[in-house]
UniProtKB/Swiss-Prot annotation:
Name of encoding gene: RSM25
Listed name of the protein: Small ribosomal subunit protein mS23
Record GO cellular component, one term: mitochondrial small ribosomal subunit
Highest taxon listed in the record's lineage: Eukaryota
Naturally occurring in which organism (per UniProt): Lodderomyces elongisporus (strain ATCC 11503 / CBS 2605 / JCM 1781 / NBRC 1676 / NRRL YB-4239)
Assembly description: Component of the mitochondrial small ribosomal subunit.
Length: 309
């Protein structure tokens, strides 16, 4: 495509039109463009060879330092190298993950308090924050929300944002955590005292479903132990009768075995289970300790990076 020079020569062309009479009035932009002409000249000037000048087109045919050892057939690069492909930012169009400090504190709390997830929670919500809007996090205990791990998270954020003396996330988290511990201990003491008072006044508490299942299972186990002990006595008697010496009538009284086969078998199984459980427990404890330490280190590093940002 030919380079357009009309925009560059617009002042000279307008002045020639004014002198010739084609334009009767001077354009409004004429003085401004004449005072501040375009700096870039788009007119293509023919190249004049000389000894001082150097043709820049010859640089295209010169080998670079990294290509000097290549053969002459590799003068032109037709595709990108591995180094050039490795420098490409392929994740530039991906949606970045949203990271919040509340999520880091929440993960850290539930990692250190796994049994907090076993408490019942209300999962029916409209927008998710209608309860938090009503809460005043200047104190831990709230009227519209039960005490749980989310209370620790919100209380930590409130202390970090409103307390000028606290500048570290871990310090604010420790303050909120100890407040949470005090309230939990107070709740447990109140429940124990209320139960003791009700028992003192004659209240009778029904057994839980777990207790009822265990008692029913134990009844069936006791009945089966009686039947198994009787069968073992019969087997011992038949064995002693078959092993009676020649000439005997086989009617000698045989003392019943004090320990049945079932009880011996149960003891052996119990000992084996204890041994296996100890080994397994030691392995699991070692593995969980390594995983928790690694996870805690990762979370602490993430929180430090977030604070630095």
């Amino acid at each position: 495509m030919r380079i357009q020079t009309d925009a560059v020569n617009v002042v000279s062309r307008a002045s020639s039109y004014l002198l010739s009479g084609l334009l009767k009035r001077k354009p409004l932009w004429f003085d401004v463009v004449a005072k501040y002409p375009p700096k870039q000249n788009l007119i293509k000037v023919p190249y004049i060879q000389s000894k001082e000048n150097k043709d820049p087109r010859n640089d295209q045919f010169e080998l670079k330092k990294r290509d000097r050892k290549r053969p002459l057939s590799a003068l032109y690069q037709t595709r990108a190298s591995k180094m050039e492909n490795g420098n490409l930012n392929r994740k530039i169009h991906r949606i970045p993950k949203l990271k919040f400090l509340e999520d880091e504190i929440r993960d850290y709390f539930h990692l250190r308090h796994p049994w907090e997830n076993a408490r019942p929670k209300t999962l029916v919500e409209n927008s998710g924050d209608e309860v938090l809007r009503k809460c005043d996090w200047s104190r831990m205990l709230q009227l519209y929300k039960p005490l749980d791990g989310e209370s620790v998270v919100q209380r930590t954020m409130y202390i970090l944002q409103n307390d000028p003396e606290v500048k570290d996330v871990f310090e604010a988290y420790d303050i909120a955590r100890f407040e949470y511990y005090k309230l939990r201990m107070a709740e447990e003491m109140e429940s124990h005292v209320a139960k003791e008072e009700s028992v003192m006044h004659g209240a009778v508490f029904e057994s839980t479903h777990l207790d009822w299942n265990l008692t029913t299972e134990q009844k069936y186990i006791d009945d089966w132990v009686k039947i198994a002990s009787e069968k073992t006595q019969v087997l011992e008697a038949n064995r002693s009768k078959s092993n009676a010496p020649a000439g005997s009538m086989g009617g000698e009284e045989v003392e019943a075995a004090q320990v049945s086969i079932f009880e011996v078998f149960c003891k052996l199984v119990h000992q084996r289970e204890l041994k296996v459980s100890k080994e397994r427990r030691s392995r699991v404890q070692q593995k969980t300790h390594e995983e928790t330490s690694r996870a805690l280190y990762i979370i602490e590093m993430k929180m430090k990076r977030i604070l630095e940002k």
